């Protein structure tokens, strides 16, 4: 299930090349003397790290945890920055380009929340100040739910396109690890309801089964269970509310669980598909 995507676009126009050069000299940053062809852009890693420093300073002042610069998110940001450079305009999604959740998921990162800032400006320091002065952009920069960011900066003459892709990244687990996390959650819920632990059964029809984005046991396996629960979530141990009813049922004695991880059209950011059987 996708969480809301937060996006923001910022265009600063009417800045002369001379003003741009003066601002960059004052901030100590380097501006390429010759613009790169749009088909072969050179991304400014130093400027990206400088932007990260400004972002994390602002987050520290706001009492928020620092963001980690993530390589997969940076690759996604660079790909979108290349699109903006080639088209000569700002956008969060061009015709034929996937939406943000898909773009980030295609790079292999696992997450459940995302946001994006894009801007066109003339210096690292100035673009950060402008983003912080805009409510929507500032919200992304200081969002406490984000823990990682990818940043791309590409110059065209003395001005730059900037992309900041934010995400709340989550750990990924092998099937067995995910199943163990779910089993631990079941044990915790049984303890909270003062019921004896359920005996966990190994079920080869469930373990690692993943078909079309669902953990699907065969019909024979299903017929032996008193209750079957299937769900999907970016975090396998985040059980749906209805799970509490069956786990808290004193008549249940045993259970088995199967989980698999997949990216689907509905879940481009990745999700665990889980089936639990109670006996």
Residue ranges and their predicted role:
Residues 20-279:
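Functional surface patches built around histidine and acidic residues
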Residues 7-16:
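Bacterial N-terminal signal peptides
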Residues 1-4:
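Positively charged n-region of N-terminal signal peptides that target proteins for export
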């Amino acid at each position: 299930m996708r969480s809301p995507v937060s996006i923001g676009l910022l265009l600063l126009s009417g800045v002369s090349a001379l003003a741009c050069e003066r601002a960059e000299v004052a901030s100590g940053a380097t501006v390429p003397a010759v613009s790169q062809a749009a088909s072969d852009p050179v991304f400014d890693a130093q400027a990206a790290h400088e932007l990260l420093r400004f972002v994390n300073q602002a987050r520290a002042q706001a009492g928020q945890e620092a963001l980690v610069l993530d390589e997969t998110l940076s690759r996604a940001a660079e790909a979108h920055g290349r699109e903006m450079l080639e088209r000569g305009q700002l956008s969060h999604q061009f015709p034929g380009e996937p939406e943000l959740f898909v773009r980030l998921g295609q790079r292999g990162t696992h997450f459940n929340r995302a946001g994006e800032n894009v801007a066109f400006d003339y210096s690292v320091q100035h673009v950060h100040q402008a983003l912080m002065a805009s409510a929507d952009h500032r919200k992304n920069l200081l969002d406490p739910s984000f823990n990682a960011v990818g940043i791309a900066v590409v110059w065209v003459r003395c001005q730059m396109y900037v992309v900041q892709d934010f995400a709340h990244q989550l750990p990924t687990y092998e099937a067995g690890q995910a199943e163990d996390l779910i089993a631990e959650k079941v044990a915790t819920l049984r303890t909270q309801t003062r019921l004896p632990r359920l005996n966990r059964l190994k079920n080869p029809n469930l373990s690692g089964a993943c078909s079309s984005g669902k953990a699907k046991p065969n019909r024979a396996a299903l017929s032996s269970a008193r209750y079957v629960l299937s769900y999907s979530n970016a975090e396998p141990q985040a059980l749906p509310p209805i799970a509490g009813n069956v786990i808290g049922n004193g008549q249940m004695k045993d259970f088995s669980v199967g989980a698999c991880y997949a990216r689907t059209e509905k879940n481009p950011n990745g999700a665990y598909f889980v089936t639990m059987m109670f006996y």
